[in-house]
Amino acid sequence: MPSLRAHVFRVPADGPDDVAGVEALFASGLQANNIVAVLGKTEGNGCVNDFTRGYATRSFETLFSRYGVDGVSIIMSGGTEGALSPHWTVFARETVETPGERALAIGVSRTPALSPEHLGRREQILLVAEGVKSAMRDAGIDDPADAHFVQIKCPLLTSRRIAEAEAAGRTVATHDTLKSMGLSRGASALGVAVALGEIDATSINDADICTRFDLFSRCASTSSGVELTDHEIIVLGMSAKWSGPLSIDHAVMRDAIDAHSVRKARERLPENSRLAAVLAKAEPDPSGEIDGRRHTMLDDSDIAGTRHARAFVGGVLAGIFGITDLYVSGGAEHQGPPGGGPVAIIVEKEQ
């Protein structure tokens, strides 16, 4: 009985347009049409005017077009503060003549475009929830408990998008383009929570988004960008329909220094295994404290708090895993408890 098999590659990047390492994978035998997703960390500021994300996305679209490949989910997260290293994480899958044995599963989907007036509102939550369910079906994940990380690239509001909506007689959730990033991330994360049964959709209203932080998903990782108007969704989990040496588990950090939870998740994975990728969310604790001690990430007028958080949590995780090419995305609204966030660990068992 055939099964699906996943492959994960961590590739260094010298800049947002550096796809040479991925092209080298093709030269070494990776079939370009087996790639389903690319997660990237680019060296921009991670804010509204971070065009490194779009630059990197266009670079990959150009690369894939040369190989006649389309439909790859390309999700770029800006910001490599501290010692975080710019890199790409490439996900591929293929059909093999091996019975399924419960291994890493990858599913992708893309939603219809989101109208600007629906950003940061219930409509976005429900749209994302349907997209996550579609990606789970694509991955062959039947039980929401088997989903360990849901990565979403979501849109934001720009001055032009706001003006177009208001010219049509519609109102938007905010006129602050930076705030729109958080609203979009938060609504998308709540969509994940609805899809996974963590939250009942009927219990959420517009006013809860980015205010009721007791509502959150333990698996969501959302990143907003100017380069799209829809949502690109990648679901990572475990499925008996897949085979191969890759496994995934996740932790939920209760705060930015919760190394214990991350280590416990690593211990649940095969002991003699190679680290394939680490994917995480980070945000400044909105209380202004970490474990009872004051932090100043939210008071810095020069550097956005999400940038501080990426650097800080990146350092914690680098100390645990001994690598700096970590996918640490800032802004964790409704993604884990306030000040914390999910961390997914992918390993490859020895064969």
Swiss-Prot record:
Site (described: Important for substrate specificity): 306
EC number annotated for this UniProt entry: 3.5.2.15
Class of enzymatic activity (EC top level): hydrolase
Catalytic center residues: 153, 223
Reactions the enzyme catalyzes: cyanurate + H2O = 1-carboxybiuret + H(+)
Renumbered residue ranges of the record's region RU B: 103-240
Keywords: Hydrolase, Magnesium, Metal-binding, Plasmid
Gene3D superfamilies: Cyanuric acid hydrolase/Barbituras, RU C (3.30.1330.160), Cyanuric acid hydrolase/Barbiturase, RU A (3.30.1330.170), Cyanuric acid hydrolase/Barbiturase, RU B (3.30.1330.180)
Chain intervals for the UniProt region annotation (RU A): 1-96
Residues annotated to bind Mg(2+): 283, 332, 335-337, 340
Binding site for substrate: 53, 77-78, 185, 223-224, 310, 329-330
Pathway the protein contributes to: Xenobiotic degradation; atrazine degradation; biuret from cyanurate: step 1/1
Ways its activity is controlled: Inhibited by barbituric acid.
Gene Ontology MF terms in the entry: cyanuric acid amidohydrolase activity; metal ion binding
Location of the region described as RU C in the Swiss-Prot/TrEMBL record: 246-351
Record's keyword annotation contains Flavoprotein: no
Biological process (GO), any one: atrazine catabolic process
Family: Belongs to the cyclic amide hydrolase (CyAH) family.
Role summary: Responsible for the hydrolysis of cyanuric acid, an intermediate formed during catabolism of s-triazine based compounds in herbicides such as atrazine and polymers such as melamine. Catalyzes the hydrolytic opening of the s-triazine ring of cyanuric acid (2,4,6-trihydroxy-s-triazine) to yield carbon dioxide and carboxybiuret, which spontaneously decarboxylates to biuret.
Entry's free-text remark on domains: The monomer structure is formed from three repeating units (RUs) that share the same structure as one another. The monomer, the active site and substrate all possess threefold rotational symmetry, to the extent that the active site possesses three potential Ser-Lys catalytic dyads. It is possible that any or all of the three active-site serines may act as nucleophile (albeit only one can do so per catalytic cycle).
Subunit structure: Homotetramer.
HAMAP family listed in its UniProt record: Cyc_amidohydrol
Protein name: Cyanuric acid amidohydrolase
